[in-house]
Amino acid sequence: MVSQCGRVHPREITQLYKEKGFSGIVVTEHYSPLTFTGFSRVFPQKRIDFYTSSYYEMKKYETEDFSVLFGMELRHYGTGADYLIYGVEPEWLKEQGNLMFPWEKKIYELMHSKGYLVFQAHPFRPYILRCNPNYIDGVEIYNGKTPKSENDKAYEWAKKNNKLMVSGSDFHTKEHIGRGGIITNERIKNNSDLIRILKSQDFEMIKSY
C-alpha cells in the first residue's frame, strides 16, 4: 500500500471485499506529508505514479461485478484534518501541483470546478481541526475506526450544517473489512455514478458497532 498505515496488499483487499459481498471500493490513499518523503514531500506531483500505484494494482482485479474507483484522502501541511475527495481521476491529478499547499477554500473551489465532492473525514477525532463547513460538501458521519461517540458528533455537525453524509470503513488492516460503506439500489460502476448517488443520498449507511 502507498499509505504508511496500510497493511494489506491491494490484491488481497479486493479479494476480501468481494468475499464480503461488496460490489466495489473507492481507493482513497493518504495524500499527505506522511506519504511523501524527502524531495517528494515538497513536490508530490513528481511521484504521482507512486501515489496511484495501489489503485492501478487493485484495478487489475476489477470485474463486471466489482468496481475499483479512484479517490483521495487529502491533508494540508500543518494540520491533522483529512478530506475525502470523491470523483477525482488519476489523469487529472497528474496535471496538478502540490495539493497540500492550498488551504480549504481554494481546494474546495478547485475540486468544484471539476465536479468533484469534498467530505471531511472523521471530524471529531481528538487531533482533528474541523474545517469551515462552507468549504465542504459533506461529512463522514460514520468511520469504521472511530468510537460511536465521535461518529455521533459528526452526524449532528453534518445535520446542523445541512451537509451530505457518508460512511467509510477506513480500511487499514483485515480487521477493518466491511466496517463501513454504503448500500445502494444500483451498482456504482464509475465515479460519475458515485457522485450522482452521493448527491442524492439515496443509500443506506453501513455501521458496525
Question: Which residues does each predicted region cover?
Answer:
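Active-site-proximal loop/helix segments of hydrolase catalytic cores
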Residues: 7, 114, 119-131, 146-149
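Short, conserved, surface-exposed binding loops centered on an aromatic residue
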Residues: 75-77, 108-113, 128-132
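Short, charged beta->alpha transition segments
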Residues: 71-72, 104-107, 121-129
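A metal-dependent hydrolase metal-coordination microenvironment
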Residues: 1-105, 134, 138-166, 174-176, ...
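Short, hydrophobic beta-strand segments that form beta-sheet elements in well-ordered domains
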Residues: 50, 117-123, 165-167
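C-terminal functional module detector
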Residues: 24-27, 88, 126, 174-209
